[in-house]
Amino acid sequence: MKFMQNICPSISLIGLGYVGLPLARLFSMKYKVIGFDLNEKRVEELNGGIDTTKEVDPQLLKEAIECQGLSFTADSEDIRDCNVYIIAVPT
């Protein structure tokens, strides 16, 4: 992984369900993370610190948004410049 030593990855986590959201929160502890989901209402709620599915503790979610650089979007242009993409959608 020597080629990644001088790169600070920005991660896009695609799919913010029961796998994607907790994973996005965990990665945000060390990296900039943009969570992507097609459900605009869900994205709006998450940006407000509200997880109606209760997959992530509300306090941990708010800390990740306010202090750790976690953000959410439904616009694919917002994740265009990420250099790591993790897909967590139903198959």
What is the predicted function of each stretch?
Residues 1-91:
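Structural/interface elements that position substrates and couple domains in central-metabolism enzymes
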